[in-house]
Amino acid sequence: MNLLIVGAGAWGTALAIQASPRHQVTLWARHAAHVQAMQTTRMNQRYLPQQRLPEELTLSHDPLSQLLPQADLVLLATPMSALRPLLTDIGPALSAQPVAWLCKGFEAVDPNAGAAPAKPGLMAHEVQTLVAPGLHAGVLSGPS
């Protein structure tokens, strides 16, 4: 199975490490420098400094629009605050693949954002229903 994990924090990286021996996994990070550092050291020094990244794990900062068509399953391992903009950006390209989010909590008002959500306090599935309805979507929960 081709897995695309969007978000190279601790949670996304841990899942990528665990899944890569059994699946073709691409771990996507939003910052090119982060990807380059992980490729060079085969470690995610910022989030999981004690864990080596398997050689078979693909690390990418390529546009998600290029990676999504190849994915059998997309895991969104971002903070809850990034879910709405991410789904707004890639939602139209996710019609065929199942997607699961790993974010915890609810959508809070970001005082640094230009515009607050119309209805703050939404859970991830509520944000998904508003922003990208019709997805084959689910949730994967883990450590708190």
Residues of each region from the PLM?
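Rossmann-like NAD(P)(H) cofactor-binding subdomain of soluble oxidoreductases
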Residues: 53, 64, 68-69, 73-144
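NAD(P)+-binding Rossmann beta1-loop-alpha1 motif at the extreme N-terminus of oxidoreductases
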Residues: 1-51, 58-61, 68, 89
